[in-house]
Amino acid sequence: MKNWRGTLTTILRSAGGKAHLSEIYPEVEILGENLGQEWKAVTRGNLERNCSDCDAWSGNHDVFALKEKGSGVWSLRTNAYKKEILDLNTKFFILTTGKKEHRDKDFEIYTWNTKKNNKVKEGDLFIYRIPQKVSLNNQFYFFGAGKIESLFYPHKDSQQYQADGDICARISKPIHFKKPIYQKNIKPKDLDGEREDWMYMFGQYGMDEISLDKFLYLLNKGTGDIQEFDEEENDIGAKAH
């Protein structure tokens, strides 16, 4: 199977965020291809390598949790947005901001044109990205996350309006990463890129749909080890960005 981490993430999400190995194995058999004779051991190995609770953790992706070793009960590691993540209608995106023609208010409003992208909907979650060409240190980086709370069409005399088809999203549940993820600290393969460089990784319109395992990777890496947020401290960080 090509993407074990993504498949296991999908299985746990469909199971309500948590499942025993005895429940995971049948789903792997259904979704997997060319599993091989040792597929159960491979399943456990992929869970362990992507879980900081385990001695076998790779030290990079941290998307699964095992609260009690030997229990066989695995769950998604959701530092935030658990309710939204478990809603199977929620999709996940990387939204690029900070462009030269900057119409957005980070952590408040995000603007785009539906003629170029019409995938994002209310309730979706996203990771914020600053592109390399406008970054002060000449590296792109991920600096926060949020939820698309509602959509509205801007008035033609507002700063958000430029052309027919423009639409705005109001952002809720903003999270400012205490640990921004810089280009130098990750590799294309961390986001399942097939190239050695970052060329073609992100779309030209600044809105890239990603799988849940990639969203959790970036969210958990950016938020660090904390499981609960100090709302006042997070609000200060978001406004200071």
Where do the protein language model's features map onto the residues?
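Short, basic/aromatic beta-hairpin or loop at an interaction surface
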Residues: 91-107
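Short alpha-helix capping/helix-loop boundary micro-motifs
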Residues: 108-116
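Short beta-strand-centered aromatic/proline hotspots
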Residues: 138-152
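Contiguous surface segments at macromolecular interaction interfaces
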Residues: 76-88, 99-102, 114, 153-241
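Phospho-regulated, low-complexity intrinsically disordered regions of nuclear gene-regulatory
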Residues: 1-14, 22, 29-89
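Flexible coil/turn residues that form the inter-helical turn or adjacent wing/linker of helix-turn-helix
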Residues: 17
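Short coil-to-beta transition motif at edge beta-strands of beta-rich domains
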Residues: 118-134
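Short beta-turn/strand-loop junction motif enriched in small, turn-promoting residues
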Residues: 33, 130-135, 153
